[in-house]
C-alpha cells in the first residue's frame, strides 16, 4: 500500500510539474506574441547595424532604406556602422542582440556564404541569424584592361586555353566573390588563369587602367562605369540576375553557359534568429514596400545596384544554395586563408 501511495504521489507531482511547465511555455509564447503585436512600441528606435563604413555606397543605400522604414513604421530607425572582418563584426552584433525586432543588420551575404568555409566565426550563420529580406544585388563585371585584346568572353577563354596561366585575373582578394567567380569559370571551361589577389579595390582599379593584368572583376559602380564609357575598360560579361540596362549588349555569365559563375553581391536585412515570426513578416513586408517606391529604386539605380525584394524564405533559400556552391568550390580549389 505504501509503495502504491508513493507511486501515486510521484505521479501527481510529475503531472503537476508538467502542467506548470506547459503553462509557463504557453505564458512565454503569449508574451512573445503580445510583444510582436505591439512592435514597434511607441518611439523606441530600431537599430540597423551596417557592415560597412559611413559614406560608402552600401551605407548610403542602408540610410535611404532606414528613412523609408522609419516613415512606414512610425518610429525612429537609426544606422550604426560596424565595418570589419568582411561583415562578420556587424553580423556577430546582430546574432548576439536581443531577438525583439529592435536590432537588424544590413550586409552582403558574404559573412554567411563565404566566411564560414574559410575559418571559425563567433556566431553560427544558420542558427543565429534570420534572413529578413533581400534588398539589392550589386552586379559583378568581368572587364578587359588595356593589356587584353580579347574582344569577347569566348575569345578570352580561347586565349586562356591556348596559353595556360598567361592570362592574369585581378580580384579584390583571396576568397573574394571575384575569386570564387574565377574558380567557377576555370572549372566550367577547363581554362587555366592566374589569380592576382589585391587587398581592396582602389589600387586594383588603378593598376587595371595601366594594364598591369588582363582581366579585372569588380562590382559595378559609377567610377567603373565611367571608365567603361570612356573606352578604358571593356565589359566582357556580367554576374547578375539579368543584363544591365547600361550595358545591354553585355551577356550574363549564365547566358554564356556558366550559371554557377553568374555571381553577384547580394545585400539584405537580417535579424537575430529567435525574433518573433510576426515581427520578421512585418519587416519583410515593409522592406518590400520601400523597395517598390520609385525614389528608392532611382537611388539604387544611380549606384548601379538592382533592387530585389522577395520573401524571407526565398532569401534564405538563395543564401543556402550559394553557401553550398561556395563550399564545393573552396574545397575543389583548396582555397585557404593565410
Language model: regions and residue ranges:
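An extracytoplasmic/periplasmic, membrane-proximal ligand-sensing/linker region
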Residues: 41-45, 229, 255, 277-338
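N-terminal secretory signal peptides and thylakoid transit peptides that target proteins
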Residues: 2-19
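N-terminal signal peptide c-region/cleavage motif recognized by signal peptidases
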Residues: 23-27
Amino acid at each position: 500500500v505504501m509503495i502504491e501511495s508513493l507511486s501515486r504521489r510521484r505521479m501527481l507531482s510529475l503531472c503537476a510539474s508538467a502542467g506548470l511547465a506547459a503553462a509557463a511555455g504557453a505564458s512565454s509564447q503569449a508574451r512573445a506574441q503580445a510583444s510582436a503585436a505591439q512592435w514597434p512600441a511607441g518611439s523606441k528606435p530600431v537599430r540597423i547595424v551596417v557592415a560597412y563604413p559611413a559614406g560608402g555606397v552600401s551605407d548610403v543605400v542602408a540610410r535611404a532604406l532606414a528613412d523609408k522604414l522609419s516613415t512606414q513604421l512610425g518610429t525612429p530607425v537609426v544606422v550604426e556602422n560596424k565595418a570589419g572582418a568582411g561583415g562578420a563584426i556587424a553580423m556577430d552584433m546582430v546574432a548576439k542582440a536581443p531577438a525583439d525586432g529592435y536590432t537588424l543588420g544590413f550586409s552582403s551575404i558574404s559573412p554567411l556564404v563565404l566566411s564560414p568555409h574559410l575559418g571559425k566565426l563567433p556566431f553560427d550563420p544558420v542558427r543565429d541569424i534570420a534572413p529578413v529580406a533581400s534588398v539589392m544585388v550589386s552586379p559583378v563585371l568581368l572587364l578587359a584592361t588595356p593589356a587584353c585584346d580579347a574582344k569577347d568572353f569566348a575569345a578570352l577563354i580561347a586565349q586562356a586555353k591556348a596559353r595556360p596561366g598567361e592570362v592574369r585575373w585581378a580580384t579584390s582578394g583571396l576568397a573574394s566573390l571575384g575569386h570564387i567567380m574565377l574558380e567557377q569559370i576555370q572549372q566550367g571551361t577547363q581554362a587555366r588563369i592566374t589569380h592576382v589577389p589585391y587587398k581592396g579595390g582602389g589600387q586594383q582599379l588603378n593598376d587595371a587602367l595601366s594594364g598591369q593584368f588582363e582581366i579585372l572583376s569588380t562590382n559595378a559602380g559609377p567610377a567603373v562605369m565611367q571608365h567603361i564609357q570612356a573606352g578604358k575598360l571593356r565589359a566582357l560579361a556580367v554576374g547578375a540576375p539579368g543584363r544591365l540596362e547600361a550595358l545591354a549588349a553585355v551577356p550574363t555569365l549564365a547566358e554564356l553557359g556558366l550559371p554557377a559563375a553568374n555571381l553577384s553581391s547580394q545585400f539584405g536585412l537580417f535579424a537575430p534568429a529567435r525574433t518573433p515570426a510576426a515581427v520578421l513578416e512585418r519587416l519583410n513586408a515593409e522592406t518590400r514596400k520601400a523597395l517598390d517606391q520609385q525614389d528608392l529604386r532611382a537611388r539604387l539605380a544611380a549606384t548601379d545596384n538592382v533592387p530585389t525584394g522577395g520573401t524571407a524564405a526565398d532569401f534564405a533559400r538563395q543564401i543556402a544554395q550559394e553557401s553550398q556552391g561556395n563550399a564545393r568550390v573552396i574545397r575543389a580549389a583548396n582555397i585557404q586563408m593565410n
